[in-house]
Amino acid sequence: MGLPWYRVHTVVLNDPGRLLSVHIMHTALVSGWAGSMALYELAVFDPSDPILDPMWRQGMFVIPFMTRLGITNSWGGWSITGGTVTNPGIWSYEGVAGAHIVFSGLCFLASIWHWVYWDLEIFCDERTGKPSLDLPKIFGIHLFLSGVACFGFGAFHVTGLYGPGIWVSDPYGLTGKVQSVNPAWGAEGFDPFVPGGIASHHIAAGTLGILAGLFHLSVRPPQRLYKGLRMGNIETVLSSSIAAVFFAAFIVAGTMWYGSATTPIELFGPTRYQWDQGYFQQEIYRRVGTGLAENLSLSEAWSKIPDKLAFYDYIGNNPAKGGLFRAGSMDNGDGIAVGWLGHPIFRDKEGHELFVRRMPTFFETFPVVLVDGDGIVRADVPFRRAESKYSVEQVGVTVEFYGGELNRVSYSDPATVKKYARRAQLGEIFELDRATLKSDGVFRSSPRGWFTFGHASFALLFFFGHIWHGARTLFRDVFAGIDPDLDAQVEFGAFQKIGDPTTRRQIV
């Protein structure tokens, strides 16, 4: 046929049977990728430490999505929350992966069938005998069916009426588990961090989709609207479908990057804004303050801080710290976290408690500065020792750990104090194993960062695709060179440009 690569899809332009075939094949590829990727991730996933080596630290991408929909057990006998299971049932991680692969195979066969048997009676216009599709009717059918699926997900799966529910956790990502969710019909349902909004919005959107689908099935579009929006042209469908996809991609890029009830931090890792705002640090200090108010010692109060909460308050888990083109999981960067060393408290020789200024997200290096409770600089690690006034040696800074593995251990030698001051810039201090994975010490992003980058990039690309195909379908006659007001009979093939008598072909 001699088509250039960027025009090959024109072969299905006026061929409804094969248009259906290639869409079924596309579904087969998507489903097959999802199932295969799930099996690969399960093969490399280590479920042994859900606290310090969770799925997002290991770079898992599809396992978090399965988990948030209610899958927690594996045929390997482990549970995502830790511990063992004896009867995971068919809907385990492997069961879902297998179902996707089986579905992919069935779609593959269906696609081949529709490619071979493309000339079906259902695609034929009775009046003309030519292939045609009633696109407004098909739109109504799709709207109705997607409405039913949307309503069913919200009313049955999420609520636990017929299904497992979804992953729900507390604001600090400590107590997450799969549970049923009641719809939130009040103003709280519009809070992106309230799980009940997921149920209520799916029920509401599904109901609207069902009603809209029935409307489009029973009411024909006016002729002027039909012609104005080119409703008979399949490229109109392509353009509006691309619009729906890029809009959804922009939305989910936002909910992933900024955080929401649909993207729990236990499954996808914390957001960069939680580091920027000191979100976990404030909660840790609040808990310690509560402990001290209950007459606990400083050591006892810090020992009650969960390792999970302390681990969130570490810059290495900030998805904005990893470069976009640094391949690999977080564990391949700074290493596998082994244990929390404890919270370091620095003091100078005058007894002031000092706080290390934390590194902002977009800095790779940052000066080590220690300030007191009033924000006054008391010590630092100087760049030029000759001019220093606040060096650790001059000020006599010591460090003592509370909680963690180094509980009640103190250091006064300047080299060790400076080492822990540098590490305190990065949040809570953890022992990291870099040997096992040959980790290079350079931070990586979490699946939260990869998902956002991918979806924002493709959304932008698809936005231009929508503009391109929308313009092509709306101005098709202009691009084809046909004057819509041309009344004269035109002999096709007589002119190089249709309807332009100045371009009459010369007979050789």
From Swiss-Prot:
GO cellular component term of the entry, any: chloroplast thylakoid membrane
Residue stretches in coiled coil: none
GO BP term (any one): photosynthetic electron transport in photosystem II
Membrane-crossing residue ranges in chain numbering: 21-36, 101-115, 140-156, 203-218, 237-252, 457-472
NCBIfam families in UniProt: PS_II_CP47
Predominant subcellular localization, coarse grouping: plastid
One Gene Ontology MF term: chlorophyll binding
Tagged with keyword Nucleotidyltransferase: no
Subcellular location: Plastid, Chloroplast thylakoid membrane
Cofactor, free-text remark: Binds multiple chlorophylls. PSII binds additional chlorophylls, carotenoids and specific lipids.
Keywords assigned: Chlorophyll, Chloroplast, Chromophore, Membrane, Photosynthesis, Photosystem II, Plastid, Thylakoid, Transmembrane, Transmembrane helix
Gene: psbB
General function of this protein: One of the components of the core complex of photosystem II (PSII). It binds chlorophyll and helps catalyze the primary light-induced photochemical processes of PSII. PSII is a light-driven water:plastoquinone oxidoreductase, using light energy to abstract electrons from H(2)O, generating O(2) and a proton gradient subsequently used for ATP formation.
Pfam family, one: PSII
Flavoprotein is among the record's keywords: no
Protein name from the UniProt record: Photosystem II CP47 reaction center protein
Topology class, membrane: Multi-pass membrane protein
Self-association and partners: PSII is composed of 1 copy each of membrane proteins PsbA, PsbB, PsbC, PsbD, PsbE, PsbF, PsbH, PsbI, PsbJ, PsbK, PsbL, PsbM, PsbT, PsbX, PsbY, PsbZ, Psb30/Ycf12, at least 3 peripheral proteins of the oxygen-evolving complex and a large number of cofactors. It forms dimeric complexes.
InterPro entries: PS_antenna-like, PS_II_antenna-like_sf, PSII_PsbB
Similarity annotation: Belongs to the PsbB/PsbC family. PsbB subfamily.
Domain of life: Eukaryota
